[in-house]
Amino acid sequence: MSDANPTAGLSDQRKLLIFGVMAFGQFMALLDIQIVAGSLGSIQAGLSAGPDEIAWVQTAYLMAEIVMIPLAAFLSQAISTRWLFTASAALFTISSLMCGLAWDIDSMIVFRAIQGFTGGAMVPTVFATGFAMFDGPKRAMIPAILGMVSTLAPTLGPSVGGWVTDVADWRWIFFMNVIPGVAITAILPFLGKVDEPNLSMLRKIDWLHVGSLAVFLGGLQYVLEEGPRHEWFTDTGVASAAWISVVGAVVFFERTFFSTMPVIKLTPFKRPTFAMACVLNLVIGFGLYSATYLTPVFLGRVRGFTSMQIGGTVFVAGLTMAVAAPIAARLSTKVDGRYVIGVGFCFFALGLWMFSNITSNWGFFELLLPQAVRGFAVLLCIVPAVGMALNGVAPSELRYASGLFNLMRNLGGAIGIAVVNTWIGDFARTHTLRLSESMSDNPEHAGGLISGLTAYASRFTPDPAIALGQAQSQLVRIVGREAATLAFADVFRLMAWIFIAALVIVPFCKPAPTDGPPVSEH
């Protein structure tokens, strides 16, 4: 194949159009990771699914996506970026339509898995394409644009899904993908070549490597998703999945190092800055997805907010991300990226620490500043991290580097949600015990609460025994609510310390210059 860059003959306007169409496809794929989060109850009722079954609507997507993200590099080399993205957009659109038409929970799980698998191909290819096509100031904007897309989409997902479900029907959270998906599929093939295919690679594909990748990452994602719900390794299914994942990992790494045609190359990790940027991206994914998950859960569980109210509250983080994107891009071209990401991590930690003062009365206005600080900080974190990871990568490794970098953020998110779910449960039980002990040690205070609640209940029932029972039940709910609130505060505080600890890595990163020519993909 030629070393020439096929995009060199394209005008800047055509390059921007290609990149814009692909970035929009990436936004759709990332939005659909979390879009069902605010609508699971409605989907469960609509498909007559059980509590354990409905969780697979999310798990199936994530398991399939995490397998495809690193695999996309090989496939884009084999059939070209243009046709991989087009095929992925087409199948993503069809699977979205079928999710909306799902007739039972089993069909929904199958179509969500296809949706996740095809969506996973669109995420890393956009990063590689952006860095391949542009140079100088335009390339410097790529991390900002894609950073905003990759953080804004999962942040807005629960809000968009909840809003659509409230005003229409849960099926429309999938139907809404159809028109833009058809447009992307129809337009992209005619915009121009990004690279040339190498179909001979398909004849030499190492299927054992592909299979072990699926078993390794799919099993790991299953353990992280299902572990918190089933007491981790005390559950036979989770323990079995963990062992299967370990076996898959052993085979995967053996094939990675010894296969004549590996589907994934780990050579980008030879660059220390790339490796450290991936670790930082893991932490960013941990904080981004965990905080995005925790805030709606708090508002729903403790405050009893509706999907619309939750969406209106968490939308603040998305707005500040949009504001921060051009600022982060500008700073990354003018200031050493290590300073930018250092400030970003400090502000992210500050935003999380502000959440640690949370009370059971917090709503939109109390959450406004912590969310704004966190939303602004995440772009200061991710924009220089993308630049550190992908600037200076050898042309032959750019696709693989992009896939690995994006994989680390998704893994960070999966680990984060699993960990914070476990922490919430453990801390809530601890605080419930402490609050109960405190009330036992202060019987006069507890008696006063019971008397007040009984007097209030007596206004609605003439039977003193019923009123007392209602008062005791209400007290139990109050203790549970306050224990949950204290647990959320503890989790946000621990997350803040994780970001502070990660600052140790930043000084050892060496950002590459952004003013070089576009890299060739071949």
Language-model regions: role of each:
Residues W103, D135, L191-D195, P228-R229, ...:
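Short helix-capping/hinge motifs at transmembrane helix termini and TM-loop junctions
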Residues P197-R203, M261-T267, T430-S438, T514-H522:
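Short, Lys/Arg-enriched, Gly/Pro-containing loop segments at transmembrane-helix junctions
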Residues S2, A8, S39, N410-P511, ...:
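Hydrophobic transmembrane architecture of multi-pass small-molecule transporters
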Residues R14-A73, Q77, S96, D106-M108, ...:
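Transmembrane core module of solute transporters
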Residues A153-P158, G162, A291, L367-S451:
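Small-residue-rich alpha-helical segments with characteristic i,i+4
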Residues V178-E196, A214-E226, I244-F258, L503-K510:
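C-terminal membrane-cytosol helix-exit motif in multi-pass small-molecule transporters
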Residues G38, I69-L213, E226:
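Helix-loop-helix hairpins in multi-pass membrane proteins, especially solute transporters
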Residues E53, K138-I145, E397-L404:
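Cytoplasmic loop-to-transmembrane helix junctions
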